[in-house]
């Protein structure tokens, strides 16, 4: 679910990690904090490297951070657009802070799903199917273990040098098989195929992979949800300003509408304004909106620009809860460095 352009990190991923510093951005001050606290792993939302480098000389802060991380044997891992797109990610954390219910993806991701079709002897179909489900197949919305199964007849002739599970070398064999169809995220393809090959009884399992253009309702950009009770525009904006400690909250003209259906996207999410309007949202909250994006929207929707840093500052809490659940005894620290480069008078 990571977008193709997103960088992921720096350093030796096989190195034993003794402690992790959790942050939004990687800066020289954050690296100094990691060194001082004995953390040899930094987990950030925004990646340090956004473009390719042909030389690293220390001429800017990114190059200085790269050199400092390498010299001090610090690994940097960044979960950027994958955390933006994921259920339970950045936007869901914002929704949690605001108190939204019935939260769902505003702009579901497309072309990220694959259909797998394979053919298995009837007696082994259940075992193979369960292995596929365990590897990540068959999840559709609030349902798992989803598949479609039809029985048919497969034929093959084993050649010299083969060791067929059924049939005889040199003779045409007919076998009653089950055609299993199921769905999976593209990023799980390798894991799923390994599971299929490990459980399928045939030497040469037949399987097909089909790219799908379906929307993936559980993954994508932005979210939309509802407040328990409607609020006035001013009441809502003041509450948002306080929750996210916003120094300067920008918004378009107040029209007296009540706010109940809320759409949002952490970071630079102005590209989702049309989707928010189409979804009938009363307000769209994001970190950055360009000047011209405000024009012509007064009657459509309330726009609220709270700042890029402010909208994503609680990302550290997501990292903490995920890692703490998986590794309860691993040393985790929240960075105390405010990396927001924007200041307000």
Identify the function of each model-found stretch.
Residues 8, 34, 42, 94, ...:
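Divalent metal-coordination and catalytic microenvironments
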Residues 12-44, 48-110, 120-121, 168-173, ...:
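Active-site loop-to-helix "anion-binding N-cap" substructures in soluble metabolic enzymes
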Residues 306-345:
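C-terminal functional extensions of proteins
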Residues 25-26, 46-48, 81-82, 123, ...:
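Active-site metal-binding loops of divalent metal-dependent hydrolases
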Residues 97-234, 246-250, 254-258, 271-273:
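Positively charged, small/polar-rich N-terminal and surface patches that mediate targeting and assembly
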Residues 1-14:
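Single conserved hydrophobic/aromatic residue that forms the stacking wall/gate
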Residues 289, 298-307:
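Conserved beta-sheet core of the metallophosphoesterase superfamily
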